[in-house]
């Protein structure tokens, strides 16, 4: 099925849902009730169950009202799940269970925030305009669903699924959020096509005119220096001070002087508009060594975890030194909406870069790794980047991406544009003995595209790999595509023959995965001063 056919199929699904929900006149409450609406969602049973057991809802008369009800239902279930998780932790003494619980409590807290953000954005007070577009809402709902999956995966990392699964499964939260995605997706397809929250000039309201100047001449609010010449000698100390701001409007710049900072940093939720500026990727290095084998979840193994909105990093290396034998070990995890990484190096082995959720842009970055070293479920674009597979363990293959799209209505995926895929120095001597693939399907609807990128002979002729050798998981439902790549490995003659793999022939098909369309970059990147190409 070519790209156009798949786009038409997705459009058809949206339109069928829209027609089923909206075609009949809705003049009175008696014409339709919540059960009828629920029947038209992907998961009607948890929808019906919730509304049956919760009185006080006004019957919806249009699709947008039903969306609000679904988001309210999902948020109610998320609040209940988080409370139960918190309760379960009171008497928990097992270190692995404690680690998973800590992640899940945070993740469900963020899910509540994303659902609340959506609710307030799409259902403004009487007379007020919507404060977000349906595109924004789809991003936040996608994040809410990703959070629940990350919680579940964390319990699998540390083999405590029997402890976590009963708590989070009983709420049916994932199915309720999937229903929200389907209905909001129908509204988005119907014509409410915004890109992101913006003012009348097309720029987001959170960006100030100072941002562009900040990249040219840094005027730091705080300075971090190993030699004691700054305000602090650790990066986290400066981040914590920024997090205590009473007013968070405007960019808060932290200048991190050259040096190796051995610490794990976290920019928490609500610590927004942080900008970390280093002295260059070879000079300012933040490094840690956490790993799953060391008792951490993949999510919490990150040397740097970024959650606050609108984060920018420039000229910094994020490194995980756990090594190839320690399994999953993240150098950088971003869950920050509208985040930017410019001229940064992200270095590790397995699971180097977790593009966890939300909209992200990487420009002129270096990414090193072995197995699934760019993974997660953000809408992430890598432009003018250098992707460097390293030498893996004996018998291992390299896999560049493992994209985690779990629902066909999530507006997520990985786009690699105008970049280069080359062997890292340690792989060069043995490059002919190690297979390297551009991606494999971590989840059923995995989506990765490689556009106008130079593929050195490090890339296997087949291009892509199943999740496990011989497995057919996701091969019909994933979306992997290539468009006008160059280099020794760019020929698609020997590529996989899966139903979900596409060689794009038209610019109009490929442009759906560019900065301008995939992450709505023209609405929020210009005033940062970060260079970018909007289209192909």
Curated annotation (Swiss-Prot):
EC number: 3.1.1.11
Residues annotated as signal peptide: 1-30
Annotated region (Pectinesterase 59), positions in chain: 221-522
Positions with a binding annotation for substrate: 298, 328, 440, 442
Residues with attached carbohydrate: 33, 91, 116, 159, 195
Record GO terms (molecular function): enzyme inhibitor activity; pectinesterase activity
Pathway in which the depicted protein is active: Glycan metabolism; pectin degradation; 2-dehydro-3-deoxy-D-gluconate from pectin: step 1/5
Biological process annotations from GO: cell wall modification; pectin catabolic process
Cellular component per GO, a single term: extracellular region
Enzyme class: hydrolase
Region (Pectinesterase inhibitor 59): 31-183
Active site (UniProt): 351, 372
Tissues where the protein occurs: Expressed in siliques.
UniProt-listed InterPro entries: Invertase/methylesterase_inhib, Pectin_lyas_fold, Pectin_lyase_fold/virulence, Pectinesterase_Asp_AS, Pectinesterase_cat, Pectinesterase_inhib_dom, Pectinesterase_Tyr_AS
Catalytic activity: [(1->4)-alpha-D-galacturonosyl methyl ester](n) + n H2O = [(1->4)-alpha-D-galacturonosyl](n) + n methanol + n H(+)
Residues annotated as site: Transition state stabilizer: 350
Localization (cell): Secreted, Cell wall
Keyword Protein biosynthesis applies: no
Function statement: Acts in the modification of cell walls via demethylesterification of cell wall pectin.
Similarity comment: In the N-terminal section; belongs to the PMEI family. In the C-terminal section; belongs to the pectinesterase family.
Name under which the protein is recorded: Probable pectinesterase/pectinesterase inhibitor 59
Annotated gene: PME59
